[in-house]
């Protein structure tokens, strides 16, 4: 059934109807639409539109419909209703007859859909927060199990300084913690109810909107009706959080894809998250990680698309706003799926410690330690930097690591170098010296793990 029509003398062209209808995607708001309708029926009692008995009859019918939708959601898509609001109202009228036609009194689809979408967003943010924290916990557990797995850290994809696999895991815990904070922050601004704002100017019925907001679980009601039906900031904020979160997951995926290559060989992924080749029998492809990396683009696109949709819209509601849902649904679904998949990748990952250690010992990753050693001997850092650069060139020429150059060779570059330099150049010394907060020393990594465990509970 259509919720409008008296003004028109011709039926809508079928092609326009298909173009205009939104049920194929806003069916996902069915539960929220029904819950919002129950609350609205209670509000209508307070202003004398419904009797208490009528409200009970409507609420009972709506609750039956809610259970029916939860049991068989696919039934919605069997309808040719224009949108989810039309579908719910049509089903309600089928159940209670003329009484169902009173429910929309004082309400517009403009404030109705804004309310539905905010309720959906609140539910989805809760799911995202749970999945985010589960991935953080998986990373912390992996870190705890790999505190002694020394590996090269990279800048410019060149070996730079030794780190540990645990320290690498904890870097992504920090990123995910910021993602968690962004979601929680967005939820604060999202948690206001637009229901009762009507089409744009507010409702003509003296409904207590704060009470109505409380019935729906919102912290408060919105303050301006024009803004309330026009506002899609919460969509932009969640898309932005998703875009940033997916960038973090994409970087996580790219790191592990590289670590998993034959050239690096730092990790081996579980068979449960890899696939083979139809031609090459030896292949074990990191498809789960590649898909996480690939799906990042569609989420960035959803954010950009929504920004462009909103940028030129006048107040208040415009049909353009119907375009807010598909991108949002897809982006948050994608983010949620990727959070779950990233946790699955960590479940069963094998860190190849000997290969990690071997790589950490290559590439002159201890060169900075030699420079710091010279500084401790009174050599200005800039001069020490130059001296070590020359020493590295000589070590490369001889095909040796720095620690295998004899003292006589090292002293050609600086006479302050003594026998005490060799312990300084060990991998363990490189790690131990990074003992400032946030560093890679075993003590700092252990503290970071303990802090994350306490925060995650």
UniProtKB/Swiss-Prot annotation:
<dbReference type="Pfam" id="PF00206">
    <property type="entry name" value="Lyase_1"/>
</dbReference>
<dbReference type="InterPro" id="IPR022761">
    <property type="entry name" value="Fumarate_lyase_N"/>
</dbReference>
<dbReference type="GO" id="GO:0004056">
    <property type="term" value="F:argininosuccinate lyase activity"/>
</dbReference>
<dbReference type="GO" id="GO:0006526">
    <property type="term" value="P:L-arginine biosynthetic process"/>
</dbReference>
<dbReference type="Pfam" id="PF14698">
    <property type="entry name" value="ASL_C2"/>
</dbReference>
<dbReference type="GO" id="GO:0042450">
    <property type="term" value="P:arginine biosynthetic process via ornithine"/>
</dbReference>
<comment type="pathway">
    <text>Amino-acid biosynthesis; L-arginine biosynthesis; L-arginine from L-ornithine and carbamoyl phosphate: step 3/3.</text>
</comment>
<dbReference type="InterPro" id="IPR024083">
    <property type="entry name" value="Fumarase/histidase_N"/>
</dbReference>
<keyword id="KW-0055">Arginine biosynthesis</keyword>
<keyword id="KW-0456">Lyase</keyword>
<keyword id="KW-0963">Cytoplasm</keyword>
<protein>
    <recommendedName>
        <fullName>Argininosuccinate lyase</fullName>
        <ecNumber>4.3.2.1</ecNumber>
    </recommendedName>
</protein>
<dbReference type="InterPro" id="IPR020557">
    <property type="entry name" value="Fumarate_lyase_CS"/>
</dbReference>
<dbReference type="InterPro" id="IPR029419">
    <property type="entry name" value="Arg_succ_lyase_C"/>
</dbReference>
<keyword id="KW-0028">Amino-acid biosynthesis</keyword>
<dbReference type="InterPro" id="IPR008948">
    <property type="entry name" value="L-Aspartase-like"/>
</dbReference>
<dbReference type="InterPro" id="IPR000362">
    <property type="entry name" value="Fumarate_lyase_fam"/>
</dbReference>
<dbReference type="InterPro" id="IPR009049">
    <property type="entry name" value="Argininosuccinate_lyase"/>
</dbReference>
<comment type="similarity">
    <text>Belongs to the lyase 1 family. Argininosuccinate lyase subfamily.</text>
</comment>
<dbReference type="GO" id="GO:0005829">
    <property type="term" value="C:cytosol"/>
</dbReference>
């Amino acid at each position: 059934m259509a919720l409008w029509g008296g003004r028109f003398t011709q039926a809508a062209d079928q092609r326009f109807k298909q173009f205009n209808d939104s049920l194929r995607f806003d069916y996902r708001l069915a539960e929220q639409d029904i819950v919002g309708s129950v609350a609205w029926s209670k509000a209508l009692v307070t202003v004398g539109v419904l009797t208490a008995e009528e409200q009970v009859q409507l609420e009972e019918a709506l609750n039956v419909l809610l259970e029916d939708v939860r049991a068989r959601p696919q039934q919605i898509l069997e309808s040719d209703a224009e949108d989810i609001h039309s579908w719910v109202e049509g089903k309600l009228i089928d159940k209670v007859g003329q009484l169902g036609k009173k429910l929309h009194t004082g309400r517009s689809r403009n404030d109705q859909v804004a309310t539905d979408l905010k309720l959906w967003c609140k539910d989805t943010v809760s799911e995202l927060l749970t999945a985010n924290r589960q991935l953080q916990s998986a990373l912390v557990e992996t870190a705890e199990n790999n505190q002694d797995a020394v590996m090269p850290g990279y800048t410019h994809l060149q070996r730079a300084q030794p780190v540990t696999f645990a320290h690498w895991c904890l870097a992504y815990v920090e990123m995910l913690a910021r993602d968690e904070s962004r979601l929680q922050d967005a939820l604060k601004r999202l948690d206001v109810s637009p229901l009762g704002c009507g089409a744009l100017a507010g409702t003509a019925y003296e409904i207590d909107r704060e009470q109505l907001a409380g019935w729906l679980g919102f912290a408060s009601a919105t303050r301006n009706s024009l803004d309330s039906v026009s506002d899609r900031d919460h969509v932009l904020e969640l898309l932005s959080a998703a875009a940033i979160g997916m960038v973090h997951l994409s970087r996580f995926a790219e790191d592990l894809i590289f670590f998993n290559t034959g050239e690096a060989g730092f990790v081996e992924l579980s068979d449960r998250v890899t696939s083979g080749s139809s031609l090459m029998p030896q292949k074990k492809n990191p498809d789960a990680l590649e898909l996480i990396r690939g799906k990042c683009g569609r989420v960035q696109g959803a954010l950009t698309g929504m920004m462009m949709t909103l940028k030129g819209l006048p107040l208040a509601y415009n049909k353009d706003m119907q375009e807010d849902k598909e991108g949002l649904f897809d982006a948050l679904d994608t983010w949620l799926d990727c959070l779950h998949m990233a946790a699955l990748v960590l479940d069963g990952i094998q860190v190849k410690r000997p290969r990690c250690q071997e790589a950490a010992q290559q590439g002159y990753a201890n060169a900075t330690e030699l420079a710091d050693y010279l500084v401790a001997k009174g050599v200005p850092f800039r001069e020490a930097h130059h001296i070590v650069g020359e020493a590295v060139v000589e070590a490369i020429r001889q095909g040796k690591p720095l620690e295998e150059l004899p003292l006589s060779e090292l002293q050609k570059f600086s006479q302050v170098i003594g026998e005490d330099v060799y312990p300084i150049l060990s991998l363990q010394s490189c790690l131990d010296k990074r003992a400032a907060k946030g560093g890679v020393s075993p003590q700092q990594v252990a503290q970071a793990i303990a802090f994350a465990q306490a925060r995650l509970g």
